[in-house]
Every structure is written in structure tokens, then in C-alpha cells.
Amino acid sequence: MNQKELNEIRRRFRLDKNNFSRIFGCYVNSNREVISWIDASLGLMRQEEQEMYLGLLKKTLSGTLGRNLIDIEFSTAQVADSDEHRLLQTLRQTECKDANARETLCRKIIESLNMGETNCLILLAADAYDVPYRGKDDELQADASGDVYKYFVCAICPVKTPTLELRYDTDENFFHPSSTGHIALAPELGFLFPAFDDRAANIYNALFYSKNVELIHEEVIDAVFRVEPPMSAVEQKNVFDTALADTLEKDCSYDVVQSVHEQLRGRIQEHKESRDPAPLELTVGDVGGILSESGVSEEKVESFRRECEKQYGENAALNPKNILGTGKFEITTPEVKITVAPENSYLIEARMIGGRRYLLIPADDGVEVNGVSVSIPNEEHN
């Protein structure tokens, strides 16, 4: 799925835009015991209650493609004949109304999910989207439908345990202790099935959501989809950093790493300005080309390519945002940490002065120390 397709489905989670009829699921305690099963009509709920349920489900389509939202790809054999794909198709085709299929999915999640001492709420809801035709001018034509996209979403939400708080009593004009009750929080993970690719159902893919890019709950991916869990965004960065340092060795200089980061950010900016809805992806060969342009020898570049193919797999598509990690340029020594906005990384230089290595930062105007404006003396004043 690309960003435009994702946004199109996200807009379905409005009261006037969807065909969600019921909310299904279950409430589970930390001992993996089902406290209650949920089967409720959305239409019979109060408006604010409907909006809250739809808001939780919509959160499973939030975040960044390739980081929080991860493509799950089924093999041809799985789609042809496998219990895991058959279960998802049953839920989709019955609009999640098959009680046995619902319980089977929920049990898979409950038995595999590691949520520590936290209770959780599992929600399921199905929708049928009459996909409007998109004209040559890229405008949607609501009166010209092309296809019906039937899908369901699953949200897995941690539940906050009750605490005592002082609450104002309007009758007594006083604050009294009162329990907050069990509160469903934003989902930690969830998924959409099937994917909405080329504005149509793609039963070979699902879109998996993880709020935490470091912890994608591989155990749930394995239990529900029976596929090799993809690398998390953090794992992708760690593998890249290690491959860069280990294969370049002494050639992994400050200038090389700075150049690589600047070129990757340049690719990201160009992609953003192009307004291409598809996520930006680079091959290992593309990154190797960036290393070559940064002055790395062909021998080291080839070594880097081999290591990346070994770790990521052949023909792997790398997300440059995952490789760069956080949106900052950070330099650390045992005693000092320097953090600048990525677009200003060029301001920092590595120099050898008097036999010692230094990192130089321009300090012309606006210098502060713990919030106090200070002046930097000119050399001739020393």
C-alpha cells in the first residue's frame, strides 16, 4: 500500500463514511483469561461511543509506512491452501460474523501475545468500501464505482488498570476519591486484511501495525500469519550501522558517514517533493553507489554489499528513513554529545589540529550556556 491508498482507507473511519455495522472482540486479563466477549451493534451506540471505537480501530492505520506499518506477504502456497489464510478469508467474507473464526483468531493472539501484567482489549470490525473510480485527472468520481473492497481490521489495545483519583462531586461541592475504572488505551498493534493495493483487495498481503517500532511483537506475526517476521525499523538501522562499520573498517571515517547521511536525506527530500505516494525504497546497490560517491574504494563497497545481502536478503528493499533512524544528526564521544538538525550536519567538521583530533562547530552569534547568552572571544583577544 502507498500513502494515498492508506489515506483513502483511513477516511472510512468516520461515522458518515463507513459500513461498519458491528464491533466484535474480547477483553482479556494478564493471565490470558477471557473476561468477556464483545458483539455489539455500532448503530445502537451513542455517537461519542461509536467515535471512540472507530478511533481505536483507525489508530491501526497510523504512523509511517515501513516503520509502524509493515507489509506482511503470504506465499502462493499459503493463499492456495493454509489454515492461517483460510481463517482470515473467512473473517473477511463473513464480515467477522463467524463466531468460531473470531474465537480462533482471538485465541491465537491471546496465546502468543506477551503484554506482561497488562490486560488487553481485542477489537474486530469489517467494512465494505464501494471504491469510487479515479479519473485521469486523479479526481475521485463517487458516482462511478469500480469495485467493492471488503476488509476487516483488528486492534489490540492495552487496558489501564483503575487508580484512585480525587473527583469533584457537584452535589456536595467537594472532591472525593473515585476510581478511574479500566480504560482502553490506543492500540499497541493490529492489522488490516487484505491490503488495499492499486485501490483493490490484495489477498496476498496484510498491513501490520506496531505502535513501537522497536518492538513489533514477532510472536503475534508468527501466530496469526505464519510468515517470517520482518525486521523492525530499529533492527534495520542496527544491521546497516554494523555492516557499515565492519566492512569499511578504517575507511568508515566521519566524512564518509556524514556524506552517506546527507545523501540519504537528499533522496528522502527529493521523494517528498515529488509527491510520489509510494514509499521510498533503495536497493543495496543504490546504497553502494552512495558509498562510492562518498569516496569509498570499490573493494570496500563490494564487501558492504555482500554483508547487506547476507543480513537483509537478496534483492532487499531498504527504507532510508529506517536506516537513518531518528530525525537528528548525533555525534557522541565518551564525554560529549552533539546533536544538530540533519540539514545542519554540514556545519560540523572533523579536523586534526596540533596532533589532536577535533570536531569544529561554528559559534558566530546566538551562543548560550545553560540559557545564558555568552560571547566567544576572537583569537586576537587572547
Protein language model annotation of sequence segments:
Residues 11, 17, 21-325:
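Long, hydrophobic alpha/beta structural blocks
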Residues 278, 287-382:
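C-terminal, beta-strand-rich globular interaction domains
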